[in-house]
Amino acid sequence: PTAMVKPTVAPTIKPSETPLPTETAAPTVKPTTKPTVKPTTVPTATPVATMKTTQLSFAKKSVYIGESITALKAEWGEPERIDPLPQKSLYGYIYNGNSQTEPYLIVGVKGEKVVSYFTIAKNFTAYDAVISADDNETIQQTKLIQQGASAQSMIDAGWTEPGTYEFDALDSSKSEARVGTEAYYKLTDNAYIYAFSDYFDGGDKSIYGMYAFSGECTKYSMMYRTYMTFTDEILRAAEQEVYEMTNAYRNYMGKALFKLEDRTTTAARKHSEDMANNNYFQHNSLDGSKFSARLTAEGISWSGAGENICAGAGDAINMVIGW
């Protein structure tokens, strides 16, 4: 008999399972954060303290309304002298009283600062200016006037004429400046300014000097003699100032300078006192004697003589300009 053979059963082979690749987890990357950069802060500069003022300038020096005495002396040096002025609490710092090369300058000082200035000089210019209060440096300038300006240019620039209550030689019937006047006037933000020409100079009546004073000073106190005080010391100072201003103008015009003479001074004082005590104003004395006779009475030999007199002017500046 045939033996029965069981068929060989192929073993069931499970297919090899390819292991699924393990997913590599992408690392969590935090987005790059741009660092917050604070804008560079420019430090705020401390504003510069400034002063708007009226400035008088020469080739190498200047002075302005509101300037401290310390700054004034640093630039100009010590004054030749300090005069008491008739305006209340005002002192005049006198520079170059006898100089033929430097500008003649009277700086009015009150409360340790400059409140006025007067000059007769070549080559000056006045400005509306802005000054640094910290270092005294000029920041900005706008020209107001300069020496040598013609009469017509003053009119064109809008300067007007002051009245006779300020300068005796002027004609009060004129409300506006015109060619040939002797003074021009302008009010700035902080000062009253007067510029002077000479009607008799034979030329174009150009500007030879100026006077400015702070707006804090009233015109009454600076111009009217009824608001002023007079002592012997103030009167003696005024005499010297009149002498210096007269020579400053003569120097400006290229003329020989005057010299003081004691006997002539005595004759002039006596006549002034006589006019004041007896309430008159004229060259001849009440007894009829003339100026020349007064010189002779003092022992002065002369070949020619002249005299200027002035009444009603408050200070030396008004006296000289009034002539």
Give the ranges of each region predicted by the language model.
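Ser/Thr-rich, Proline-interspersed low-complexity disordered segments
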Residues: 2-50
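Second-shell loop/turn segments in exported
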Residues: 56-62, 137-145, 227-237, 251-261, ...
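A well-ordered secondary-structure block
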Residues: 119-200, 291-323
